[in-house]
Every structure is written in C-alpha cells, then in structure tokens.
C-alpha cells in the first residue's frame, strides 16, 4: 500500500498488487492464443461462407439476389469456366483455417493442382484469343465482360496470354507443356530421374554379352542339371500313366533312360467287351420297359442311331512323350527351388493332368505362382493348377493336349455308370480327366445353371441332356417344357411325346409358360397335402398301391437363353424362376437354364442363390468365371466341350470333357421317336392359358399412350421426364408408357446416355 500526500487535507492511497513474473507471462500468452484462435475461426467461417454463397450463386442464381448475380458475373469475367472451381477452393481454404487454426501450410501437391488449373484456363483462353484480341487489350476485356459464352479462361488468363502470344507466337505450346510437366512433378512428389528409373526397371534391356556373374550362374545350372539327371537314373521312380482310352501295355526304355517299374494301366479290350454286353443289356431293359406298359406305345431309340468313337488307342510314342513332359515339369520346378515329383499322369480327352507330390516344407502357393513358367517350359498355351486335388494329397497341373479327342455320347450311354443309374432324370455329361464316364442325376441337383461363351459347347450339352432323357425315360415318366428364344436351337424336338407343349419361342409366351409352371407346382403341393405325402416319390408310391388314380410325371423345364428373356420381361422371369428354384424340387419339377452372357444382370442374386449346381464352359474373363462358379478357372478352359462342373455338395469344380452329339444324330433319334410313337398330344389347356396371359398383357395399354406419342412427335424429344412433366403423371407410369412406345416401334431402344430416336412422324399417324 502506498500513500501519496498532495497537501495537508488530501491524501491518495494506492494499493498495488504484484504478480509473479512467470504467471503474468502465461496469462498474456493464453490471451494471445485465444485471440488468435478466435480470429482464425472467424476468418475460416467467413471464407467458407463466402465460398458457399459463391457456389449457390453459380448454380442457383435466382436464390441469391443482386449480389449473387453480380458475383456470378464477376467470377465468369475474371476466371471464366474456372468460376465453378473457385467456390470449392474457397470452401477448402475455409475448412483448413478452422482445422489448422489459421496456420495453413499448403503442400507441393496443392500448388501443383493450382498450376494445372491456371495452365488449363490459360490454354482454353489462348484457343479463343483471336475472338477477343484485336490489338487493344481493353477491347478484349470489354468483349469478355459482355460475352454470354462462359467457356473461356477469363480476363486474368487473357491478360497473361496476350504477352505470351506476342513473345512466343505458336510456340506457346512448349511453355504450357513445360508447366504441365512441372505441375505433375509437384503432384507426384517425385523427381524426373526417379520416374525415368522406374520405367526403365519395367523394361529390361537386351544384353548382347553375358556378364561374368551370369556365366557362373549358367555353369552352375548346367552342373545342377547333370546332377539331377544322374539322380533320376539312380532313383527308382514309379509314374502311373492313366489314359482315358484305358490302354494296357509296357513301355520300352527310351535311349537308356532308366525309369523302372512304370505302371501303365490298359483295359481297352475289356471295356469294349463290357460296352457290348452293357449295350445289349440296355436294349433288353428298354424292350422290357416298353412291353410292361401296355398303354404306352413309346419305343426307346436304339444305340445304333448314335455315332461310335473310332479314335485309335494311345501309342507307345505318346506315352514316351508324356514321360518326357513329366521330366520337364520336374526339372522346371527344381530350377525354381521347388522339390516335387510326378506320381501319376492322367491323359484325358482334352487335357493331361500331372499329379505332383511336393516334399515336406514346400508351400502350395509357390507352385501355383509358377503357372506361367510351367506353361513356357512345356510349350503349352496355358496351364490350370488344381491345388490340392480333392481326396488326394497331390497337386494337379492340367496341360492342354496337342490334339483334342472327342467324347461321343454313345460311349457314356453304353457305360456301366449310365445303365446302373436308377434315376429317371440321370443324364450323360462326358468323361473326366481319368477317363471315367460322368453321369449325374438332375433330381439331386435339383436345378442346373449352364453358362459359357458362344461356341463353347452349351447347346451340345443341352442336346446331350435331352437325348439322355429320351434314352432313359418314357413320356409317362418325364415331361419336357422347352423355352427357346433363339428359335432354332430346340425346335427340332417338336413332335416328340415328351413335350407338354410345342417349343416356346416367343419371350412373352415364355413368361406365361413359367407362370403355368408355378401354378402347376402349387397344384401339386395341394395334392400332396390332401394325400399326406411330402414329395412326388411318395405320391407315385400311392399310385403303385392303387390309392390314387393317376401318376405324376417329372417335369424338366429347359431354358436355352436366359439373357433374351431377361431383356423382355426381367421382373416376371426372375420371380417365376426364383419361386420354382426354391420350391419345385419336391413337386418333381426341375430347371435347366443356359445363358451365354454370365453377367450379374442376367444371373441375378435370386437365381444364383437358388441354383447351386452349375456348369461353366469357356468364358472370356475371370469375372465371368466368378459370376458362374464363385471361383476362377473357367477363363482357362479350351472350349469345344471343355467344362467345369460344380454339383451341389462339392467343394471344388470337376473338369470334364463334355459328350459330343451332332445335329444329324439328334435328327436321327428324334425322327425315330416320331415315327415309332403315337401322335403327340399337347396339353391344350396349357397353350390356352399361355395365350390368354399374353393377350391380356398386350391389351394393357395406357390410356395416355396416344397423347404421349403426339407430345414426343411435336417436341421431337422422347424421354420419361418429358412425358412426366407434360402429362403431369408419376415417374413409374411415364416409364411404362415409354416401354409401350418402344414395344410398338414408335421410338428406339435406350442406348446409354444417348437420346432415343423417334421412328414415326405426323404422316404416319
């Protein structure tokens, strides 16, 4: 406390409070920090608000008043087309102010992006310089201000471009390219030398003379090769060769190579004798079946209508070639440090599988990654690696054969596997790599999806399925419902007694046929409930016990091209197929669907989830393979019937060479059935129901269709939004009107973002 005496009567008392020096400094610093933060927040919010207002002014001028209009005009005058980027840049800077609290340090990438923008605006303005510059810069500025065209660089770019053009002339491109290169270097944050070195690493240089280190490596590899050959001669290796023709015989050693105890299995003569016996038994069984049913006049076609495979058996030279390829494969793997040996070679119709047994400690992934190197050393177009082979502790390397051998349908039908199958819906697929005939049962699938590129073998596979059913089942046991939007594929089967109705070729009628199938499925389930049975087998057992009047046949629904149906009526087709796939199994109805376009808009999630069994032929990409099989591999197939079969319950797909049947064989079998059977009687009630559904759908025209047609002819525009605005209707109704106009041929189909073409005029009306 301090007392100050001014005179005898007046005294001033001052009380001074002393603070420690460090506390006083901290208080001042905190005040400054809070003040700086507040200022940066105010600045950031102001800049962001200004940028947001500028953005609204650019896109919604009517909402921002006089200031917004003036700002839009000013921005277009100053920076031209860059006016659309300017508000975004301002809002970005405002956000940075708020986050960084006013301490903004922009990176080189930010400056690089800005140089690209400025350089682009200058380049745009340079292209239009002759429109604005006539020798007087001010006149050009006035023209830019008064111009209604916004596609220019603005006054700033104009002022910069005029001296550049006067100094450099047409050589201004060099300057702009230089600025682009500099900006790209700033954005990439790499030097030009680094970029050049990275590109040089990707392109190996040709070396005319090997270096000393390379010479040592080559000598070392040659020594290793000699050691491997000596080791191979010492080790007694057992390589089992399995030919799909099942030939027996021993192979002589080739030029002193000591491959001891090579087990070669051959049973061609035995198989030929067995096939003759089985064929005779099959024909006897067919005769008994047709004679036991007195009411049926169906006569099964004989095996002689099908072509016989006359392919020669595997020669000794071919076996020597297989052994040589097995040695090359082992040497290739050894050169990459993979210790493995070939334990079996299986020669299939289209590919040969080498079964490898890797040593302990060798990773499977290491062998998979060497697929390209294996194909190079074996001079193959490509290899497929199956790791591991299901049921074996081995890795399969599938190499395409030089000469493809066809598998004829007669071979599989005469096989013991087909004749012993008791199912009515068993059909022949082909042969696997080991030469075993593959016969599958449609009742266990219970539905099948077939996909593949054009010419890969889908139609042949469907023909083998149908012909197999004709050899296996009478019309009272199995009925067929065929849908063929391509018209020419399945029409040959018209007239056989197995068909419920003639082959459906109209896509709209196809939707009606599927609708009938759904209704039939519902009727069968009601029938099962009335008789206390769960499925078609239980109901037919009641028929054998004379407890019901009629027997229910199995129904196989075959769709040859799903993509065409999905284009015409996708919603209905997807719903019907989804319901059938979910519920039709117990009712004795099975789907076989084929498509050559395995995209997700054709094979939808609903269809894919309810059809677990799939066959994939050769496809063009790995994406298509994953769409069909949920795994890759189909893109490496060879075509011509080479397929991957993934039945329900199997963890991995099986590679099969599909059975082949040509058009002449199909016509012979179908012609025999037509001639020997009674006249086919189609279900008229099904045909009437389908036709009524089609006529009903065609008669559902919108009442505003004619008015919409007049509008698009007068305006010369055809769009859903136009009809929606003019007629004041909802989007769904306007879209349906557009679909009806397209169906009637008044407008063209939709082609991406391009406008539809109007195909009629006033005279046509």
Swiss-Prot record:
Which InterPro entries does this entry report, sorted A to Z? FtsK/SpoIIIE/SftA, FtsK_alpha, FtsK_dom, Ftsk_gamma, P-loop_NTPase, WH-like_DNA-bd_sf, WH_DNA-bd_sf
What's an example GO cellular component term for this entry? Answer: plasma membrane
Query: What are the entry keywords?
Result: ATP-binding, Cell cycle, Cell division, Cell membrane, Chromosome partition, DNA-binding, Membrane, Nucleotide-binding, Transmembrane, Transmembrane helix
Q: Which residues form the FtsK domain?
A: 435-626
* SMART domains named among the record's database cross-references: Ftsk_gamma
Signal peptide bounds: none
Q: Which residues cross the membrane?
A: 47-67, 75-95, 110-130, 167-187
Q: Where does ATP bind?
A: 455-460
The source's domain of life comes to Bacteria
PROSITE patterns for this protein = FTSK
Query: What membrane topology is annotated for this entry?
Result: Multi-pass membrane protein
- Provide one Gene Ontology biological process annotation: chromosome segregation
Say where the protein is mainly found.
membrane
Compartmental location? Cell membrane
* Chain ranges on the Cytoplasmic side, renumbered to this chain: 188-765
Which GO MF term does the entry hold, naming one?
DNA binding
According to its UniProt entry, the function of this protein is described as:
Essential cell division protein that coordinates cell division and chromosome segregation. The N-terminus is involved in assembly of the cell-division machinery. The C-terminus functions as a DNA motor that moves dsDNA in an ATP-dependent manner towards the dif recombination site, which is located within the replication terminus region. Required for activation of the Xer recombinase, allowing activation of chromosome unlinking by recombination.
| Family to which the UniProt record says this protein belongs | Belongs to the FtsK/SpoIIIE/SftA family.
Its assembly, as annotated, is: Homohexamer. Forms a ring that surrounds DNA.
Query: What is this protein's name?
Result: DNA translocase FtsK
Which organism does this sequence originate in?
Clostridium acetobutylicum (strain ATCC 824 / DSM 792 / JCM 1419 / IAM 19013 / LMG 5710 / NBRC 13948 / NRRL B-527 / VKM B-1787 / 2291 / W)
Q: What is the lineage of its organism?
A: Bacteria, Bacillati, Bacillota, Clostridia, Eubacteriales
């Amino acid at each position: 406390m301090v007392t100050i005496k001014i005179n005898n009567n007046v005294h001033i008392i001052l009380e001074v409070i002393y603070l420690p020096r460090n506390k006083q400094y901290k208080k001042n610093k905190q005040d400054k920090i809070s003040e700086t933060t507040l200022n940066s927040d105010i600045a950031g919010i102001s800049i962001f608000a200004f940028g947001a207002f500028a953005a609204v002014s650019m896109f919604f001028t009517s909402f921002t008043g006089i200031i917004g209009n003036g700002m839009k005009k000013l921005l277009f005058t100053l920076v031209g087309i860059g006016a659309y980027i300017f508000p975004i840049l301002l809002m970005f800077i405002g956000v940075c102010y708020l986050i960084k609290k006013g301490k903004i340090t922009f990176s080189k990438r930010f400056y690089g992006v800005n140089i690209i923008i400025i350089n682009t605006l200058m380049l745009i303005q340079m292209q239009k310089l002759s429109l604005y510059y006539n020798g007087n810069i001010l006149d050009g500025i006035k023209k830019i201000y008064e111009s209604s065209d916004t596609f220019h660089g603005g006054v700033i770019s104009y002022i910069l471009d005029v001296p550049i053009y006067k100094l450099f002339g047409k050589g201004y491109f060099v300057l702009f390219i230089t600025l682009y290169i500099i900006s790209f270097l700033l954005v990439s944050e790499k030097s030009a030398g680094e970029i050049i070195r990275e590109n040089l690493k990707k392109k190996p240089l040709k070396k005319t003379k090997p270096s000393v280190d390379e010479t040592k490596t080559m000598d070392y590899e040659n020594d290793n090769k000699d050691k491997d050959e000596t080791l191979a001669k010492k080790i007694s290796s057992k390589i089992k060769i399995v030919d799909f023709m099942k030939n027996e015989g021993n192979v002589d050693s080739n030029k002193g190579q000591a491959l001891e105890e090579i087990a070669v299995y051959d049973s061609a003569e035995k198989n030929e004798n067995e096939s003759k016996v089985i064929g005779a038994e099959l024909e006897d069984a067919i005769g008994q079946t047709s004679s036991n049913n007195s009411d049926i006049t169906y006569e099964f076609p004989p095996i002689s209508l099908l072509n016989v495979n006359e392919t020669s058996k595997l020669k000794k030279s071919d076996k020597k070639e297989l052994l040589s390829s097995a040695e090359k494969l082992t040497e290739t793997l050894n050169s990459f440090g993979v210790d493995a040996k070939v334990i079996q070679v299986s020669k299939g119709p289209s590919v040969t599988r080498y079964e490898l047994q890797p040593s302990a400690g060798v990773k499977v992934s290491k062998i998979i990654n060497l697929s390209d190197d294996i194909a190079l050393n074996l001079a193959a177009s490509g290899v497929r690696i199956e790791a591991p082979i299901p049921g074996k502790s081995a890795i399969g390397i599938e190499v395409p054969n030089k000469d493809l051998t066809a598998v004829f349908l007669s071979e599989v039908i005469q096989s013991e596997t087909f004749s012993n199958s008791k199912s009515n819906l068993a059909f022949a697929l082909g042969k696997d790599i080991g030469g075993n005939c593959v016969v599958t049962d449609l009742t266990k699938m219970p539905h099948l999806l077939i996909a593949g590129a054009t010419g890969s073998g889908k139609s042949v596979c469907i023909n083998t399925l149908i012909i197999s059913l004709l050899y296996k089942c009478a019309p009272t046991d199995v009925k067929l419902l065929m849908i063929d939007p391509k018209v020419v594929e399945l029409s040959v089967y018209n007239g056989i007694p197995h068909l419920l109705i003639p082959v459906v070729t109209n896509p709209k009628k196809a939707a009606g046929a599927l609708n009938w199938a759904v209704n039939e499925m519902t009727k069968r389930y009601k029938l099962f409930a009335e008789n206390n049975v769960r499925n078609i087998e239980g109901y037919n057992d009641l028929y054998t016990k004379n407890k019901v009047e009629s027997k229910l046949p199995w129904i196989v629904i075959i769709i040859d091209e799903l993509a065409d149906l999905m284009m015409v009526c996708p919603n209905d087709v997807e719903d019907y197929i989804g319901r059938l796939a979910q519920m039709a199994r117990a009712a004795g109805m099975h789907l076989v669907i084929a498509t050559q376009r395995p995209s997700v808009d054709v094979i939808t999630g609903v269809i894919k989830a309810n059809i677990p069994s799939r066959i994939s032929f050769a496809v063009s990409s790995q994406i298509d393979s994953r769409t069909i099989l949920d795994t890759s591999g189909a893109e490496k197939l060879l075509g011509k019937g080479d397929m991957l079969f993934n039945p329900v319950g199997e963890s991995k797909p099986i590679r099969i060479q599909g059975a082949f049947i040509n058009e002449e064989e199909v016509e012979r079998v179908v012609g025999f059935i037509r001639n020997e059977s009674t006249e086919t009687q189609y279900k008229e009630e099904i045909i009437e129901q389908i036709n009524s559904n089609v006529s009903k759908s065609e008669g559902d025209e919108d009442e505003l269709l004619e008015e919409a047609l007049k509008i698009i002819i007068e305006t010369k525009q055809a769009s859903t939004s136009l009809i929606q605005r003019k007629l004041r209707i909802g989007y769904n109704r306007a879209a349906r009107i557009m679909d009806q106009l397209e169906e009637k041929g008044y407008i063209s189909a939709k082609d991406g973002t391009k406008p539809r073409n109007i195909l009629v005029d006033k005279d046509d009306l």
